[in-house]
From Swiss-Prot:
Residues 189-217 form a propeptide. Residues 189-211 are annotated as: 3 X 8 AA repeats of S-P-R-R-R-R-S-Q. The lineage of its organism: Viruses, Riboviria, Pararnavirae, Artverviricota, Revtraviricetes. This is External core antigen. HAMAP family: HBV_HBEAG (MF_04076). It comes from the Viruses. InterPro entries: Hepatitis_B_virus_capsid_N, Hepatitis_core, Viral_capsid_core_dom_sf_HBV. It is found in: Secreted; Host nucleus. It comes from Woodchuck hepatitis B virus (isolate 2) (WHV). Residues 188-210 have a biased composition (Basic residues). Residues 26-28 are annotated as: HBEAG. Homodimerizes. Keywords: Disulfide bond, Host nucleus, Host-virus interaction, Repeat, Secreted, Signal, Viral immunoevasion. The record marks R188, S189 as: Cleavage. Residues 180-217 are annotated as: Disordered.
Length: 217
């Protein structure tokens, strides 16, 4: 249903249903829906990342297929991240079908170029962001991705003279967290190995009992 309204809006068909389509899609676009809220993130945090930060859609799709093909094509529910990846892939598949339909039905080359560029710059970018976010959460962990986004936002909003020259890297964050956990565990181990003073006191009465028969003789 929404694809029909999208076709009317993009093709700019001069018919009475055009205004109705704009109203229908306006209700949908006007809702404050942020699909990253349930994962502890937001659209605003992801928008701080530059456009060239996100890989190409073909690379993201190949990565998702190579790593999680069984989980994505299976019937069982694995995690909310797998479900989000499924929805992103289905959405992009429908958009590509829409572009192919408009390319074959719109005669103006200029209009087709404008539509394709608009789809790639808007919805294509959202699909890239969604696939990158959920694939990163499955690879590095959701908490690690949250820490990376917050640290990147702090880094990029800090003036250049007062920040490190290089931006935070997502792949280095899990190593630091492992080192911190190991250090905390290592500091507790010496306390457990120290002998308690009660054991030394318990040995003294035994020595006195062993000496008592020799004293009687």
């Amino acid at each position: 249903m929404y694809l029909f309204h999208l076709c009317l809006v993009f093709a700019c068909v001069p018919c009475p249903t055009f205004q109705a389509s704009k109203l229908c899609l306006g209700w949908l676009w006007g809702m404050d829906i942020d699909p990253y809220k349930e994962f502890g993130s937001s659209y605003q945090l992801l928008n701080f990342l530059p456009l060239d930060f996100f890989p190409d859609l073909n690379a993201l799709v190949d990565t998702a297929t190579a790593l999680y093909e069984e989980e994505l094509t299976g019937r069982e529910h694995c995690s909310p991240h797998h479900t989000a990846i499924r929805q992103a892939l289905v959405c992009w598949d429908e958009l590509t079908k829409l572009i192919a339909w408009m390319s074959s039905n719109i005669t103006s080359e200029q209009v087709r170029t404008i539509i394709v560029n608009h789809v790639n710059d808007t919805w294509g970018l959202k699909v890239r962001q969604s696939l990158w976010f959920h694939l990163s959460c499955l690879t590095f962990g959701q908490h690690t991705v949250q820490e990376f986004l917050v640290s990147f936002v702090v880094w990029i909003r800090t003036p250049a003279p007062y920040r490190p020259p290089n931006a935070p890297i997502l792949s280095t964050l899990p190593e630091h967290t492992v080192i911190r956990r190991g250090g905390a565990r290592a500091s507790r181990s010496p306390r457990r190995r120290t002998p308690s003073p009660r054991r030394r006191r318990s040995q003294s009465p035994r020595r006195r009992r062993s000496q008592s028969p020799s004293a009687n003789c």
